């Protein structure tokens, strides 16, 4: 397997403040769980050979049922998540160790980013083939204030949001996780981890529509954008 998508669906979605307590990745948009929308995109991409999903333990059976219901292909395994996002990603990587001799490219993506496109995945893979990694970014659309000791306004033209997918060769990202465990460091994402350990990163631009569903506002934005895509595909407008 040359390319394996590692989809993180292990979050509890506390910032969504859901009365039901259901994790955000299982919320429905167009009568389909958000995680399934995301998995469909990767399963239909010609360059993705297999998919590993990291999921909350108590929802693994539900995910198995949804994958069967919507006929999602290329699933290698569903892995139990850890206490943190970083530990969850490592659990996914650990399940891929059997392919380590091939040293596949690992396409790390959030299960709650269902608006990633095939073209954006392809651009990331092309960059990773040439340079060893690829980090998705989008242009900052609002002014950013940096405030550590003395507040300063950053030049928005030089600011970007770091998003996903983030693509690394297996051995590189696995070794980075091992170093982070040894040093007892927790990072917000793989790009931050790689940067901390001095790895040169390469960037590919994606659309600002590649939203990570974190808050109720994000849910309504993603829902509206997906409905707009459906209308466009039907009527060509």
Curated annotation (Swiss-Prot):
Q: Name the Enzyme Commission number(s) assigned to this protein.
A: 2.7.7.-
**Pathway it belongs to?**
Capsule biogenesis; capsule polysaccharide biosynthesis
The molecular function GO annotations come to:
2-C-methyl-D-erythritol 4-phosphate cytidylyltransferase activity
**Biological processes, Gene Ontology terms:** isoprenoid biosynthetic process
Q: Which Gene3D superfamilies match?
A: Spore Coat Polysaccharide Biosynthesis Protein SpsA, Chain A
Q: Which of the seven top EC classes does this enzyme belong to?
A: transferase
Q: Does the keyword Iron-sulfur apply?
A: no
* One Pfam family per UniProt: IspD
Q: Name what cofactor the protein needs.
A: Mg(2+)
This enzyme catalyses: keto-D-fructose 6-phosphate + CTP + H(+) = CDP-6-keto-D-fructose + diphosphate
Q: Which UniProt keywords apply?
A: Capsule biogenesis/degradation, Magnesium, Nucleotidyltransferase, Transferase
**Site for Transition state stabilizer, residues:** 15, 24
> What family does this belong to?
Belongs to the IspD/TarI cytidylyltransferase family.
| Function text | Cytidylyltransferase involved in the biosynthesis of capsular polysaccharides. Catalyzes the formation of cytidine diphosphate (CDP)-6-D-fructose from cytidine triphosphate (CTP) and D-fructose-6-phosphate. Shows less than 1% of activity with ATP, GTP, UTP and other sugar donors, such as D-fructose-1-phosphate, D-glucose-6-phosphate, alpha-D-glucose-1-phosphate or D-glucitol-6-phosphate.
Protein name listed in UniProt: D-fructose-6-phosphate cytidylyltransferase
Gene name for this UniProt entry: HS5.18
């Amino acid at each position: 397997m040359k390319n394996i998508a590692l989809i993180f669906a292990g979050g509890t979605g506390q910032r969504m403040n859901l009365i039901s307590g259901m994790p955000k990745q299982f919320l429905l948009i167009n009568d389909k769980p958000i995680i399934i929308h995301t998995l469909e995109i990767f399963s239909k991409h010609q360059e993705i050979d297999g998919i590993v999903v990291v999921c909350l333990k108590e929802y693994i059976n539900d995910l198995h049922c949804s994958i069967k219901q919507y006929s999602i292909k290329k699933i290698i395994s569903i892995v139990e998540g850890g206490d943190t996002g970083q530990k969850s990603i490592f659990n996914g990587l650990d399940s891929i160790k059997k392919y380590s001799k091939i040293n596949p490219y690992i396409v790390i993506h959030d299960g709650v980013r269902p608006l990633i496109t095939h073209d954006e995945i392809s651009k990331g893979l092309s960059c990773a083939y040439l340079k060893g990694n690829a980090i998705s970014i989008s242009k900052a659309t609002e002014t950013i204030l940096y405030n550590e000791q003395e507040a300063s306004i950053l030049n928005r033209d030089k600011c970007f949001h770091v998003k996903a997918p983030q693509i690394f060769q297996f051995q590189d990202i696995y070794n980075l996780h091992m170093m982070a465990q040894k040093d007892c460091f927790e990072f917000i994402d793989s790009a931050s981890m790689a940067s901390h350990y001095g790895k040169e990163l390469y960037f590919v631009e994606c659309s600002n529509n590649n939203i990570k569903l974190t808050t109720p506002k994000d849910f309504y934005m993603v829902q509206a954008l997906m409905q707009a895509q459906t209308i466009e595909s039907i009527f060509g407008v």
